């Protein structure tokens, strides 16, 4: 777990630094600082609420899709789409797993941390920039 959090923090740091071009000009970049505590909360909440269907490694199961699909890139499914799917459920539309029911019992800070965790894993695996 510590290795994953360290890797995610390092990935986020590298992504923040990627805005510097060779011309010496800095390209404006929005960077959010993610604490180790938030990543831990996200990982723990993901395991508790999401991993049965989406896999311990975000690669999916026979019950739900992988988050390493172009469907889940930020420009296709924004963070808000993840949050709404958890809160309201989601009708089957990309996969043949059936409808996703709303997930009960997730606190707002846990939900935000889950999305941050999933995006961090996607970045660490080279799935998103």
Could you tell me what each predicted segment is?
Residues 16-19:
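C-terminal motif of bacterial Sec signal peptides marking the signal peptidase cleavage site
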Residues 6, 39, 108-111:
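Short functional linear motifs
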Residues 42-56, 86, 100, 114-118:
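The canonical Cys-X-X-Cys-His
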Residues 21-45, 129:
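Electrostatic cytochrome c docking/interface patches
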Residues 61-70, 88-121, 126-129:
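Axial heme c-ligation environment in periplasmic c-type cytochrome domains
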């Amino acid at each position: 777990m510590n290795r994953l959090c360290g890797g995610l923090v390092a990935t986020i740091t590298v992504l923040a630094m990627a805005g510097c071009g060779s011309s010496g000009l800095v390209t404006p970049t929005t960077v959010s600082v993610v604490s180790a505590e938030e990543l831990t909360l996200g990982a723990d909440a993901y395991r508790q609420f999401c991993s049965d269907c989406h896999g311990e490694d975000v690669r999916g199961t026979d019950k739900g899709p992988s988050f390493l699909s172009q469907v889940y890139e930020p420009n296709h499914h924004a963070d808000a789409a993840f949050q709404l799917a958890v809160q309201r459920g989601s009708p089957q539309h990309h996969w043949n797993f059936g409808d996703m029911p709303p997930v009960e019992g997730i606190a707002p800070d846990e939900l935000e941390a889950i999305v941050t965790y999933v995006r961090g894993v996607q970045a660490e695996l080279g799935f998103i920039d």
